[in-house]
Amino acid sequence: MIRIDLKQDDMPDHWYNILPDLPEELPTPRDETGEAFETLKKAVPTKVLEYEFSGERYPKIPGEIYEKYMQVGRPTPIIRAKNLEEFLGGNIKIYLKMESYTYSGSHKINSALAHVFFAKQDNAKFVSTETGAGQWGSAVALASALFGVDSHIFMVRTSFYAKPYRKYMMYMYGAHPHPSPSEFTEYGKEVLKKNPDTPGSLGLAISEAIHYALDNGGKYIAGSVINSDILFKTIAGMEAKKQMEMAGEDPDYVVGVVGGGSNYAALAFPFLADELQSGKVKRTYIASGSKEVPKMTEGEYRYDYPDTGKVLPLLKMYTIGYDFIPPAVYAGGLRYHAVAPTLSLLMNKGIVQARDYDQEEAFKWARIFSEKEGYIPAPETSHALPILKEIADSNRGEREKKTVLVSFSGHGLLDLGNYAEAMHFE
């Protein structure tokens, strides 16, 4: 079977919340200023905060969101990468959960729809958010258009100019993208005054988006890291469990890339559910990131700010520091300084392994994948591909083929200019 499709009538109608199943209680956020929690209450949609700390394992997806999931391309297919399997020696089976098949071209729309819906329930004048490479920003723009909500998107400055096509997508959906740091917030003005040539960072953009929402009557929505955002995205993993069962397959490995952690967690957590509940983890879970932003392999597991402006509460997570300004790599979605607290805890317990690959290695595999499978991965997604060679090499000579499930988080059709620059195309 090359393609595993799930009928819309069979699409899961619940999300999965990992909090009740973690091996130990998630460290609580800290408010060192005495103002961070109050800021959260004002800035974030009410229902999103309820989900953030909920202990309900399988909350039902509201009907309005469920309907929009189907409108934007869900369920997404799982496709077997047979040509890549052969290239790697034929001793593993590779299945790709194709989140690139959504209208926005990535997994980000899965939570954007939920966040915007709940902001609308709060009668928000608009939503504001950050975005790195633009996948999250374009997803929020699409979700806002579908629910009739205005949106302001603070896009990391280096990506704002290097990735214009996602910015154009946002405009097409009626959104208002701004380069971050920007002149639209006092915080942005301060940063630009100190360093007018800054490439920006996701931490900076988060701070700007929060300030803009608070000062202008909007609601801030986060595109990764927080529990609720991961929860909303688990529709992908819930679908994948059904699809793999349909194919008579059970993955030995679950792999994917980490920017803030929501992409990988959304696929992996529903598979981890039964294992965590039984106390026995049998699958191998591997998350990969950018070596230029090595939070998983060189970061510390400690409390840190999720944003550069220190507006939000401190979270315990793997981090290389809230004030880290990453280099201007093309995988803008991987430039975040930390890893989601839930995923960080699992990494700290040895349940999830971590890898980091540099841009050259990742892009080499993006080229190979494109030639073998005929589909161009996003620069971020390409950072998961070197794991496949590692798995193939480690299982060479085994009698039974191992099964690998990959979160194919987005396509690279709007990133061709970046690939061209990096690979020196004419």
UniProtKB/Swiss-Prot annotation:
One of the record's GO cellular component terms: cytoplasm
Keywords: Amino-acid biosynthesis, Aromatic amino acid biosynthesis, Lyase, Pyridoxal phosphate, Tryptophan biosynthesis
Gene3D superfamilies associated with the record: 3.40.50.1100
Enzyme class: lyase
Keyword Cell membrane carried by entry: no
Signal peptide: none
Purpose: The beta subunit is responsible for the synthesis of L-tryptophan from indole and L-serine.
Assembly description: Tetramer of two alpha and two beta chains.
HAMAP family documented for this protein: Trp_synth_beta
The protein's name in its UniProt record: Tryptophan synthase beta chain
Organism: Thermoplasma volcanium (strain ATCC 51530 / DSM 4299 / JCM 9571 / NBRC 15438 / GSS1)
Taxon lineage: Archaea, Methanobacteriati, Thermoplasmatota, Thermoplasmata, Thermoplasmatales
Gene name tied to this protein: trpB
